[in-house]
Amino acid sequence: MASTTSTLSLSWSNSFHSFAGAISEPQKSPENCRVMLPIVAQKKVKKIRKIILKEDIPDLGKKGQLLDVRAGFLRNFLLPLGKAEVVTPLLLKEMKMEDERIEAEKKRVKEEAQQLARMFETVGAFKVKRKGGKGKQIFGSVTAQDLVDIIKAQLQRDVDKKVVFLPDIRETGEYIAELKLHPDVTAQVRVTVFAN
């Protein structure tokens, strides 16, 4: 039994040494006389997948964003919960069309805001009547809602009171109100307050 084990270990060590020798020594192929070296990979290749998020995920991205994630994260978390889709050429085409549509809508909204701002600036001043007190004081104050009501009455335009920024008006006189119609478009209107 001992002789069988020793011959097995000898044959195994011989085959290992011959394999190790083949790796360390370059081999020449007879037809081209080129040196051939075997390539041995050190690490596994990371498997990364391209995805599009279906909803906002904290610390990862926003809805509609194109991301690279590891295959395991996609397979074990994102796909079972329905939070992402694997990118396909058709999906990329649809995403591009959706982006173009959104950009066109943003451009249209901005143009409408610019047109509305020009209209406000050509109007001149909006007049507000209040019951007068001593000197220049008025009873109460002029609020953003008052200005919104006046704009609706005079121009037949609905404006949200959240976009109207007025100084604190408690006296008669002329004031400048700012209307933030769009992140890039701001209109300034004059508000004249007088007592009856």
UniProtKB/Swiss-Prot annotation:
InterPro entries: Ribosomal_bL9 (IPR000244), Ribosomal_bL9/RNase_H1_N (IPR009027), Ribosomal_bL9_bac/chp (IPR020594), Ribosomal_bL9_C (IPR020069), Ribosomal_bL9_C_sf (IPR036791), Ribosomal_bL9_N (IPR020070), Ribosomal_bL9_N_sf (IPR036935). The keyword Thylakoid does not apply. SUPFAM superfamilies: L9 N-domain-like, Ribosomal protein L9 C-domain. Transmembrane segments: none annotated. PROSITE patterns: RIBOSOMAL_L9. Its main location: plastid. Keywords: Chloroplast, Plastid, Ribonucleoprotein, Ribosomal protein, RNA-binding, rRNA-binding, Transit peptide. Pfam families: Ribosomal_L9_C, Ribosomal_L9_N. Belongs to the bacterial ribosomal protein bL9 family. Component of the chloroplast large ribosomal subunit (LSU). Mature 70S chloroplast ribosomes of higher plants consist of a small (30S) and a large (50S) subunit. The 30S small subunit contains 1 molecule of ribosomal RNA (16S rRNA) and 24 different proteins. The 50S large subunit contains 3 rRNA molecules (23S, 5S and 4.5S rRNA) and 33 different proteins. PANTHER family: 50S RIBOSOMAL PROTEIN L9. This is Large ribosomal subunit protein bL9c. The lineage of its organism: Eukaryota, Viridiplantae, Streptophyta, Embryophyta, Tracheophyta.
